[in-house]
Amino acid sequence: MDMGKLPRISEKISNISEKAVRYALVGIVAVMTVIIIFQVFLRYLFLFSLSWSEEVARYLMIWASFLGASLAVKYGLHIGVEYLVNRFPPGPKRAVAFVAKVSILLFLVFFTVGGLQVAWALRDQDSPALLFSMFYAYLSAPVGGVFMIIQIWNSIVEDWVK
């Protein structure tokens, strides 16, 4: 592959992944909102509570957190220790930022692989109210990890070609 095309390909994959995550988050938040409003409505007007609504909302919130983290990676919104880095001159500052991003990438690879191993190990465990495999709840970590890897990779490529 021509290395000149890498930044464009990386950016395209990053943008497609961002769009997919945004659509997923809109759907997740919409479903979560409807379920919670319906639950509150039933509880206060009819003194009836759904056994599964809080569990669904909890798992949707977990999915939203991991997916949303990839958008925070793309836009550099995660907490960072910039005080020390900003004291460096431009050359070393760029090198430190590059090493930090590569370290984050390596962490995310381990996080994603570890998350997949945990999800697989818990595939036979059922959730308390819904009785579906906990694999799907724990799958949020590796899926979010993949989307974060895509975004940090794109950031590394962008920094490399500057």
Language model feature labels by segment:
Residues M1-K162:
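Alpha-helical transmembrane segments and membrane-interface helix-loop junctions
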